Regions:
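Conserved non-catalytic scaffold segment of RNase H-like nuclease domains
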Residues: 1-79
Length: 79
């Protein structure tokens, strides 16, 4: 079994960027066994070029959970 994790962030690079969406799929080689997807409030504005790239807007994440609010779920699904 393995996990496939996809994240979208507020920008390129690793310094100062925040997650805006996370998707996790648990795969056994034949089929997806578990799936988790959530928008994430990055607590900073999403630049227009990232919105154009991902389709994720500031309005979409305004009331989404902050990462620390879903961290336990992320940990549990990837154990």
């Amino acid at each position: 079994m393995y996990s496939v994790v996809d994240i979208e962030t507020t920008g390129n690079g690793y310094k100062g960027q925040k997650i805006t969406e996370i998707s996790i799929f648990i795969f056994d080689g034949q089929q997806i066994l578990k799936e988790f997807t959530s928008l994430v409030n990055p607590e900073q504005n999403i630049p227009p070029f990232i919105t154009n790239l991902t389709g994720i807007t500031n309005a979409m994440v305004r009331y989404a959970p902050k990462f620390h609010e879903i961290a336990r779920q992320v940990e549990e699904i990837t154990k």
